[in-house]
Design a protein with these regions (language model features):
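Macrodomain-like recognition of ADP-ribose-binding/processing modules
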Residues: 1-160
Length: 160
């Protein structure tokens, strides 16, 4: 499938985004409070605060911890990590993968609003396509609809 024109692809580490200004690193979290596999390992190696904030959020501190919600953590000046809850549990249920596309759409709409306010670009791995079991064709369509179509620059990193 041909990549969407609003998504740029790069080889590199999504935890080290290439940006001239404000940037948001987005990734998918599950709705059961689990953190420790997948892209979050790379995040935790760079910064402790996204995991700490996620665990506090799951414990009931802050906005509701539910599918479609997003938590923004500033990890460096002009750099945020967006913990997006778009994965139901960590295992397939009834043959369905853990990713929830509608929750991803809702979360990305919140990311778009945040990025518009901060004049930030978005950086990510191929979210939702590893442990969450999603299909990149579907995920990239949602990314394009919710971010690219709203003028938000998106870079997807493939780790070398």
């Amino acid at each position: 499938m041909k990549p969407f024109p609003t998504i740029k692809y790069a080889t590199g580490d999504a935890t080290r985004p290439v940006s001239d200004g404000s940037a948001v690193i987005v990734h998918i979290c599950n709705d059961i409070g689990g953190w420790g596999r997948g892209f979050v390992v790379a995040i935790s190696k760079r910064w402790k605060s996204p995991e700490e904030a996620y665990r506090l959020w799951h414990a009931g501190n802050g906005t509701p911890f539910a599918l479609g919600e997003v938590q923004f953590i500033e990890v460096e000046p002009q750099l945020w990590v967006a913990n997006m809850i778009a994965q139901r549990d960590v295992r397939r249920t009834g043959g369905a993968p853990p990713i929830r596309y509608e929750a991803l759409r809702l979360a990305l709409s919140k990311v778009a609003a945040f990025c518009a306010e901060k004049e930030a670009t978005v950086h990510m791995p191929r979210i939702g396509c590893g442990l969450a079991g999603g299909d990149w064709a579907e995920v990239s369509r949602i990314v394009d609809d919710e971010l690219g179509a709203k003028g938000i620059s998106v870079t997807v990193y493939d780790f070398p």
